[in-house]
Amino acid sequence: MSYLSELRKIVGHRPLLSAGATVLVIKDGKILLNLRSDTETWGIPGGGLELGECLEETAFRELKEETGLNAEKMTLVTVLSGKDFYFVYPNGDMLYSVVSLYLAENVSGELKITDGESLKLQYFSFDNLPNLESRAKTMIEWIKENRKDLIG
């Protein structure tokens, strides 16, 4: 059981503050997205920091858990937080996220859904994106405005 799941048992649906890592996998100018099972919207692979873990470790772990992929290196792109990273899950859980956005480099492995958090994994061009979860939309807008070099 994750640390956040344990906290949820104590605080119920009240807002929690969570640090986590989100991982950009970009291949041939396309971004890897996951169709989330909890919201049925597309997001960027990632998740919450566990006790004793550094954010880079979170990025490596979440990439493997959610996509089946490995990366040789994670490069920190930016840290994002604030009102745009407040999220209410369909079950009513409220969360303020502090997101460390990483770029996965030298990615290997075979795409596969391994954890039940994703319904589908797919690469999309930045100019033809599906229905995005709000935090993913904010991160992609940030990339388009501040790090066009990542898009290709």
Task: Indicate where each model-derived feature is located.
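Conserved Nudix-box catalytic region and its N-terminal flanking loop in Nudix hydrolases
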Residues: I26-E66
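A generic structural micro-feature
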Residues: H13-L17, N91-V98, D115
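Active-site-adjacent beta-strand/loop module that shapes the phosphate/pyrophosphate-binding cleft
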Residues: L80-E110
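Nudix hydrolase/Nudix homology domain
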Residues: E40-T41, G109-G152
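A short coil-to-beta-strand element that immediately follows conserved catalytic motifs
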Residues: N70-L80
